[in-house]
Amino acid sequence: MSDHLVPLPGTPWHVWRDVLVRSAGFPADSVDSLAAPGFAATADAYLAGGQGEAELESAYQEAVRDLREAVYAIAADPRFRQAVTWQNPGALLAVEGVLRDGPHASRNSRRRQREDFVAKYWQRYCVKNDSIGFFGPTSWATVDSAWPAMTGRPGPTLVRSQTVHLERWALVALAERIAEDPGVRPWLPVVLQPHLAVRGRELRFPNRPAQQLTAPVATLLARCDGRPAAVVARELVATAHGGFRTEADVHAQIRELAELGVLRVGFDLPVRLSAEEVLREQLERIEDPPARKWAVGLLDQLCAARDTTAAAGDPAQLTAAMAGLASTFMELTGRAAQQRPGETYAGRTLCHVDAVRDLDLAFGGAVLARLAPLDPLLRSGRWLTSAITAAYRDAFSELHRELADELGSPEVPLGQLWYLALGTVVGAHPVAVDVVAEFNRRWERILGLDKVPAGVHELRFTTAELAGQVAAAFPADAPGWTYARFHSPDVQLCATDWAAMARGELTVVLGELHIGVPAFDTDFFRTGHPRPEALRAALHHDLPESRFHLLLPEDFPRNTARTAAWMHAPADVQLAYVPAPGADRDRLLPVSTLTVAPAAGDADAGDLVVRAEDGRSWPLVEAYADLLSVHTVDAWKLTGGRGHTPRVVFDDLVVVRETWRTTVGQTGLAGPTRERDRYLAARRWRASLGLPERVFVRVATEIKPCFIDLTSLVYVRILCNLLRGAHAKAGDDVEVVVTEMLPAVGDAWLADADGNRYTSELRLLVRDPQPAPR
């Protein structure tokens, strides 16, 4: 067994020794400042007939006073203002408005909006493990079965290090501005679009017939591998049979081919955090000294403004520095200093900060033992990827047969099959959707979720009693594709404090199970790892076979520099099917160069392989693996369509939190508008469903869930506004999912040097003992 693996006790699975720790940046109990348990008790008594109007109004006014003071105190916290500034500089106006108005300001609609704003950010920073900045730092830990439950220490500061990255879109804007300069234009890199290929005097496309080229154009395209246009022109004119008399002729031909979409002319920045380094390298290759000095100088100006932002030590300095960065950017590029305002995952501002928590941790046998009940879920995850592969084998085979009959050959161009098959993967009705639904139905039958009596809040199972049913329901000998050998569970540890964790007095809660993906393969996660290349080597050890990585277009959903894959091995292949930036020419395979045929000796079984010109081959499903994982990564969802799902526990591992499903109309909270009426309606709704006071609520019209404290005036108001907005968009039937908060605030054990405790979670990488068949 390799040094990077640790056995999961009592199972055939192995866990990577490296563990990612994700955490909040503000103490968990800080959300208590916005709670109003006294007012909640009075409101409940009022609804039950035990309190009168006068008592209710008095308690309400007291809750209002407490809320005003609490919101003011949060707004006065320099770290809070700094966090908000990093995420949304323009939004700081609302925080500053609270400070100007003071803790006892009258509560008009503008003041309430500001309270809502502060509370929304506060819950993100205190009880959600969003990995961003010092308000969501990450760190790396290790695990070994021979060690004590938990050892380590927090450092003297919250953050050990942080890095400020310019957003890729900002670098692209600068690169495009530089490229407009007449002195730079001849030195722009010129490259064949990655999905195209030149073979002799033939230009191959993925989805249309090849185009015959003149000899000079074929010679030109063969040299377009990222060399500057001026270099290509110089070389062709100097070539005896290049076909061009002057460099101007070459440049004119390059412009024409670029307009036709054949060539990409310009600085080519990958969708990765290395985009700044790549741009600098390309600028340094400009051979004209004045043009190079000017171009590099523009990048230096932008980076200097970024560095000033990174060095800002307080909210005022940060605000000024970010304004300076925005001014510099607009002066250099002539463009707005923000993109896609209001969108999630958009990288809206010019830069972002990633932080490493000042923390050293190691976990031992007691934690591993409590992870062992993941075994049934991991086995079912293997089945899911295998079943999806089987379903696509059938779908792909049918498409292949039709195309082979049309072409009169069993070997068909992948470029022609690609787009037909793509519709079954990411189209309106992907084949995988039915498999995922069946996956959850089988689990619901095993757990008897359709037969749970009313009033049951928890279901407990032993892994021993589940073993037979899981084996029967999820039979699979191996995962479906290469990457599917990995599953990435996010687990949260519940303990009363640091000392209890060290003694092994803990409960483990499964937050999410990312099936069929190695979630460490995310660019910004390597920021704090002491030896990131060791992670890459470990992945290559576990997946020695060559793999496909799709070269995605810039507008692909959630395709960002922070989340880009980075752990490719030397033998891995970059598969290009559309124009896209950042192609690695050493690994690139355009779909236009590949063919698909039945596996050798397997013409009737439906197993298709992709073949390269050099003889390499892969199962066809591997070409779509990145897209298939989109269907598996969040497939584990057992709440179904019923109104209530109890908490589900395997041995001592919580695998499903207690969950309630309802609709906007059924809550009755979208209608009331007066604050006190809303609060009473929320207390009535909470009692009718038996909800805990603190929950996470996901409204179908929103991307992310929101923490809601049902004793809090401001969080009840936020909830009602969410529901009212959803009703305005889509009516009464918008789904609302409510989940218990587990771990609770009191279960936060991760401490800083001052004893403040933070929510946290561990992201693990679990390896299947069996590799995917090849």
Q: Which residues fall in each region the model found?
A:
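Type-3 copper protein
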Residues: 1-158, 249-546, 732, 736-774
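Acidic, low-complexity/disordered tracts enriched in E/D and polar residues
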Residues: 115-223
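Basic, Lys/Arg-rich alpha-helical nucleic-acid-recognition elements, primarily the DNA-binding modules
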Residues: 203-210, 219-224, 246-257, 263, ...
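Short amphipathic beta-strand/extended segments with alternating polar/hydrophobic composition
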Residues: 204-216, 405-414, 617-626
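Glycine- and acidic
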Residues: 206, 214-220, 234-237, 377-382
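Short capping segments at the starts of secondary-structure elements
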Residues: 221-231, 235, 241-243
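C-terminal structured domains
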Residues: 495-729, 735-744, 752, 756-771
